[in-house]
Amino acid sequence: MNTIIPLLLLSLLITVYAYALEDGNKEEIQDIAESEFEASNEMLQLAHLLEADRAETEEDRNSRQKRCWGANVPCEDENSPCCSPLKCEKTFGYGWWYGSPFCVRSGSG
């Protein structure tokens, strides 16, 4: 009888300890599962951001500024695509020396 009581007490302590470990393992497994779920959400958000960035890049590519004509390039009329500070004007010598107007700075001629 003296040996049975300590053995029963020891077995009781072992089972209580095992249940405590099992609860801890369940919490760890649950934490791991939650972190994996968060990682998949982050990947999904990243995919949406990349898709939006790709669409924005496509828009930028299609809305590129049209090429313009540089200085002293012959042009047809005032609607010609001369670069920003330049305008299509009839310069000195237009008609008797030059056959068409040129892209020049405004007021220089």
Curated annotation (Swiss-Prot):
It is found in: Secreted. GO terms for cellular component: extracellular region. Its main location: secreted. Residues 19-67 form a propeptide. It comes from the Eukaryota. Probable ion channel inhibitor. Belongs to the neurotoxin 14 (magi-1) family. 07 (Jztx-56) subfamily. This is U26-theraphotoxin-Cg1a. It comes from Chilobrachys guangxiensis (Chinese earth tiger tarantula).
